Amino acid sequence: MTTENRTPRIIEAKEIMTLLPHRFPFLLVDRVVDFQEGEWLKAIKNISVNEPCFTGHFPNEPILPGVLILEALAQSMGLLAFKTHEIQGGELFYFAGIDDARFKRPVLPGDQMELYVEVIKERRGITSFIGRATVNGEVACEAKLMCARR
């Protein structure tokens, strides 16, 4: 990510919903706080005690499931892809792969999860990314992700 002085490029929830097909309870990006087409994107997800997953994961010790952290990263990846490429009617970016996922700290109710995805490589409609979710500067999850344009 570049460190030059510039105004952050924000994408609010209303626009996110025009870009992604996901809806409650599976829309897992609240706001994009900055991005650079074809390079990187930073977003946030505020974790509420009212998240439906906490009913069963776990009733007396609520922890955001790792798969939902990965899904939030995948949705961030999709947002970057949609903002980078002109899309023909009906085209989507599909989550196509994951490697080297590591979970380093729990994400709990009340946390603000910061999501960061960066393009590593793009070839023949497949884009590879590195993704990282943090809470208060501490890494919660890191993974290599891929999406496919279809």
Curated annotation (Swiss-Prot):
Could you give a single Gene Ontology term from the biological process aspect? lipid A biosynthetic process
Name one cellular component (GO) term.
Answer: cytoplasm
Chief localisation class: cytoplasm
The alphabetized UniProt keywords are: Cytoplasm, Lipid A biosynthesis, Lipid biosynthesis, Lipid metabolism, Lyase
Where are the catalytic residues? 57
| CDD domains registered for this protein in UniProt | FabZ (cd01288)
Coiled-coil regions listed in the entry: none
- Family designation: Belongs to the thioester dehydratase family. FabZ subfamily.
* Name of this protein: 3-hydroxyacyl-[acyl-carrier-protein] dehydratase FabZ
Q: Which organism is it from?
A: Actinobacillus succinogenes (strain ATCC 55618 / DSM 22257 / CCUG 43843 / 130Z)
Instruction: From the UniProt record, report the name of the gene that encodes this protein.
Output: fabZ
